A protein has these predicted regions:
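CheY-like receiver
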Residues: 79-82, 141-146
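Acidic/polar active-site rim loop that often engages polyanionic ligands
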Residues: 101-105, 124, 148-149
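Donor-nucleotide binding loops and adjacent catalytic segments primarily
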Residues: 2-82
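Short, structured coil segments at secondary-structure junctions
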Residues: 35, 65, 101-102, 128-129
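Short acidic-hydrophobic, aromatic-tinged amphipathic segments that line or gate anion-handling sites
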Residues: 68-71, 131-142
Length: 183
């Protein structure tokens, strides 16, 4: 594990169900047992605010986990980069930002949103081994039973020339000379 910090983000709206679970003794204990010592929570517009700034472990190893929170930030990139684990809502933008940063991710689906797009995206990316996908009710269990988070598959680097090659192929330019930026 590169960092002992967990970053939790709910996005720009509210996801109190996620914040409440993170704030529970069971979840904090599960994180502590995984070696995490600090949790930073981005609350969004939610109403649940953690009342404590630390949790003292109950397990055999004891330990303590610090808890910090804030509402919004112009960018979450540094929080993501500084984390050893991100626990996030299932929004596509956040999922992709975390995967591109190559930080282990647990995506928590907000079932109160319309449609099922978060479950579809999270489920597919979990099936491909890139993240763990769960719900607020199953988060603690997922954290307790997950294998080594470092074994999640990294998101592949972008192929910036793929679209151009596809266009060339579709237009019949497969034998065309390389573009200047390809050389």
């Amino acid at each position: 594990m590169t960092s002992n910090t967990v970053f939790v983000t709910v996005g720009t709206t509210s996801f109190d169900a996620l914040v409440r679970v993170i704030d529970s003794d069971a979840c904090l204990e599960a994180l502590l047992r995984r070696g995490f010592r600090r949790v930073v929570i981005q609350l969004g517009t939610g109403t649940h605010v953690p009342a404590r700034d630390a949790y003292a472990g109950e397990g055999a190893g004891g330990g303590r986990i610090a808890i910090e929170h804030f509402r919004h930030s112009p960018s979450l990139a540094q929080h993501i980069a500084d984390a050893g684990l991100v626990i996030s809502h299932g929004g596509a933008g956040t999922i992709m930002e975390v995967l591109r940063a190559r930080t282990p991710l647990v995506a928590v689906i907000n079932g109160k949103l319309m449609g099922n797009h978060q479950a579809e995206l999270g489920g597919e990316l979990a099936a491909r081994g890139h993240l763990i996908c769960t719900t607020p009710k199953k988060l603690v269990s997922a954290l307790q039973s997950a294998d080594d988070l470092a074994s999640l598959l990294p998101w592949p680097d972008a192929d910036e020339d793929a679209f151009g090659r596809l266009c060339d192929e579709e237009m019949g330019f497969a034998g065309a000379p390389a573009r200047p930026h390809d050389e």
